Amino acid sequence: MKQDFYEVTENEQIAPSVFKMTLAGDTSPITAPGQFVNIKIPEFYLRRPISICDWNDKSLTIIYKAVGDGTRAFGRIKKGEKLDLLISLGNGYDTSLSGDKPLLIGGGVGVPPLFGLCKKLIAENKTVNVILGFNTKSEIFLEDESYKVICTIVSKQNSL
């Protein structure tokens, strides 16, 4: 675990009430997909835990749904602002247990941590299939990014 300030380089809405935020800073403590961060919001006492969607040497990406006062406040954060984060929380996924042809299943805001997991499994030369579920067509996110790296089946509860 590491506490530090990270600069917001992107915070954009990607689906109804769903936002993608990229934060620049030291990501070296992140060791596995599936880990999360705890973010301090200036006007709130408690930090908000958000799973890490993806990361590289210089930044990390989170995807969050604005459902309460805290996550709605995230939506008002502007590019260039600095946020206090605790990073590299949780154990993450142990890919040694996945076998050669893992099937990943997730829905809604459970989808983001699967993106980093899928990238790691592919880097390990595993054949990955993913099933993503969403309530409506308008709520689908990461579809374009997912198709670049994986075979994906996207389902939704309502009809097209």
Tell where the protein language model's regions lie, with residue ranges.
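FNR/FR-type flavoprotein reductase catalytic core
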Residues: 69-160
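Ferredoxin-reductase
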Residues: 2-81
